[in-house]
Each structure stands twice: as C-alpha cells, then as structure tokens.
Amino acid sequence: MSSQIKQVFARQILDSRGNPTVEVDVVLESGAFGRAAVPSGASTGIREALELRDGNKALFLGKSVYKAVENVNTKIAQAVKGLDALDQRLIDKTMIELDGSENKKNLGANAILGVSLATARAAASHLRKPFYRYLMDVKEYLMPVPMMNVINGGSHADNNVDMQEFMIVPAGFDTFSEALRCGTEVFHTLKKVLIADGYSVAGVGDEGGYAPDLPSNEAAIEAILKAVKEAGYEPGKHVFIALDPASSEFYKDGKYELKSENKSLTTEEMIDYYAAWVEKYPIVSIEDGLAEEDWAGWKLLTEKLGNKVQLVGDDLFVTNPSILAKGIEKGIANSILIKLNQIGTLTETFEAMAMAGQAGYTCVVSHRSGETSDTIIADLAVATCSGQIKTGSLSRSDRIAKYNQLLRIEEELGENAIYPGIKAFVFNSDEEVEEVVQEIIVEDSEAEKVVVQVEE
C-alpha cells in the first residue's frame, strides 16, 4: 500500500502545565498512523521559532492554540496531502515554504512541528519499524546519559533560587537502567536531606524537581552532593553535576543579578563564579551560563572553561543551524541543546545536529518545561546517538514517560545498547584527555536517516 499522506488532523490538548498545545494525527494511504504532541517552553530564547497562540484572554487566559490547529487542518493539510511520508525532507520543505517567514510566525512552529513529527511516526509505522530504528537503522546504538533536574529554580519554580536547573548526571554506570536506578535513589534521598536541613519540599517545579527556598545557589549543589553520598554513591565517580543557570533570565542592563545572594556580577565576575564551582565540585556541564546576547562573554567563558566542562548553548543557539554556524565560527561553546520546537521541523533539527557533530560539538536532546506524555525525544536521542538527554526529574508522568521509553528501547536492543557514561561529555582536563569524536551525517534515502559514528 502507498505511503502517501491521506489525512492530517490537529486538535488542541493540554500540556503538563495545563496549558493548551497542539496534537496532530497523520494517516497514510496504507492505513499507517502517526501522532505527535508539541511541547512548550517557559524560558524561551528570543530567536526561537514562533509558537502561535491566540492571545484571546477569554480563552485559556490567552494561551489557546485554535489558530495553529486551524492552520494544520486547512492550509498545511491541503499542502502535504498526497506527498510521500517517507520523504521527510520534502514534507518539511513544503511547510517551511508555505509559511514563508524566517521564524514560522505565519503558520506557527507548533503547527508545523506537529505535522513534521506525526508524519515521521506514520512513516515508521508504515515500515513497521520502531521510531528510533526508522530514523537510523544500525546494529548498535548509544543510550543517552540522563541529566536529571532534581532542584528547580528560576522560571521553572516559585522559589528564591536564581538558577533554573541543578541536575544529577549518573554517568558512572554500565547501562542506562543502572543509571536510572541511581537517579531515582538519589532523588528520593534528596527529599529526606532537604527536610532534615529544614527546607520545605511540599511541591515540585515544572520539571519534577524539588523547589525549596535556599540561602544561596551553591546550597543546592551542597544538598545534592549530600544526597548522593547518603544514597550510597560517590560524587565524581558514580554521579556528576550539570547546571542550567538560564542566565538570560537574570541578566539585566549588562549585569548578572543573583537576587538570592544579593549579588550583581559583571560578565567576568560571573565566569569566575562558575570557575570556582568547577574547581570545587564534580561539574561536567553548564548550559546557558551566560546570556544569549552576551556573545563576547561567551567567548571568554569558552576560553576559560571550554577545556574543563561541557558548555551548552540553548537560548544561545535555539537549535538553529544558521545561528550555530556563527557560534562555531567564533569558537563559542562546545555543545548545543536540541529542542525540536525551537526550530520547528525534524529536518532542521537533524541539520543542526549534523553541523554540531562535524564541528566536534556534543548534542544534548532536550524536553521543554511544558511537556506531554509524548516520548519522541527518547527515540530521537537513541536514533542520533547523541549520548545525552535532558528530560526532567524522577517525578511527574510527563517526565517519567521518556525514561520508561528508554528502558524499553535498551531492553529491546540488549547487548547492542551502549551506555557511554562519562565519555559522552567532550572536554579536556589537566589530569586526563578524553576525546570522543562524533560525526553526524544526514543522508537522503527512502526515509530521513541520521547516521552517527562514534570513535574513541
């Protein structure tokens, strides 16, 4: 039966914050079916593709997405009907040209992405392949090392912590399932530690981590390391630390305003702040350490810490190949965060990952703070052998859904699932040089495939 698109239908559903988002169904002539739900961010980069919302305060406080849904059910459906779902590049190119804007503001990135992902899922169903294997069909796959956001702050929580994410990285294990077990044990132990130290853990943040008021940002790291030890693990051997300060959120008038510590820091002082932490704690990754518009500062940060830790650009690059190219040219950062809805199509996401890999940058596949039960990013992380994933803490079903999907994939792959551990992080230190070369090549074939080779 034909793999041509027969029907495209969108609806409005709710995300993990109770806000409307877009869900799309695609049916092929063969009867194959694909469905995808689109996530949404809280702290968003100024150069992200546009998420189209209606703005009518009488409906969902202005957050409804009926216009984006209408765009899928009319303009986009008419444009892609009859196209071959196995030609992902053509599907995405058709929608990009139909939109006609630089940031997908006319149809909405949330409308376009929903169709892009649902079409890919339908194509995988047509070929009767798991989604990750449809994207890349090879013998061995890298399972991603998870960055687990166990203490939430910033825009993700209603507390006094300036920095947005304090994450544990269980990189000292041989399998993903062992790493996940460690993460859950540390997460539950952390609750006991926080309570014993007199902090409230009555609720969790958007990504499932605890959100206590703390005396300083550093207090979050200290609490986490205490929990790691009490859970029976060794910091720097079994568990490492990753940070996402989301510093654009506290960058005001050229200064970094750490209100919880009553500090106003220059770019140079902020870099020194991180450098002191890197020397003191087992930190392997810092995401958005400086503001997205502070490119001169990013250059200094990379020169000072780029050979010691992974420096991830999220708001800095917004999964955009053209912006990433500028960063590579200027020697800024050494890693990119991959968020599907920042760019709006699967094809452009692959292009960004290909460019990053060819430049020696690592790729971290990521969720958004407003998530759904959709597990596409788990398959994407495995398919591209990115080696790293951010999908929240060890609570909230919208986060756990991705971890459970990774467990299923590892089980299915058996000995062909490789957990890279600390080798997933590309950086040099004075004590040891660890080189991991990633080459990501986007190939044209019957299905859009990403081929990833990892050499040690």
UniProtKB/Swiss-Prot annotation:
GO biological process terms held by the UniProt record: glycolytic process
Pfam family, one: Enolase_C
Residues where (2R)-2-phosphoglycerate binds: Q164, K339, R368, S369, K390
Entry keywords, A to Z: Cytoplasm, Glycolysis, Lyase, Magnesium, Metal-binding, Secreted
Reaction(s) catalysed (UniProt annotation): (2R)-2-phosphoglycerate = phosphoenolpyruvate + H2O
Cofactor stoichiometry and binding remark: Binds a second Mg(2+) ion via substrate during catalysis.
Enzyme Commission number: 4.2.1.11
Cell compartment(s), UniProt: Cytoplasm; Secreted; Cell surface
Cofactor(s) named in the record: Mg(2+)
PANTHER family xrefs: ENOLASE
Function summary: Catalyzes the reversible conversion of 2-phosphoglycerate (2-PG) into phosphoenolpyruvate (PEP). It is essential for the degradation of carbohydrates via glycolysis.
Subunit: Component of the RNA degradosome, a multiprotein complex involved in RNA processing and mRNA degradation.
HAMAP family: Enolase (MF_00318)
Record-given protein name: Enolase
Source organism per UniProt: Francisella tularensis subsp. holarctica (strain OSU18)
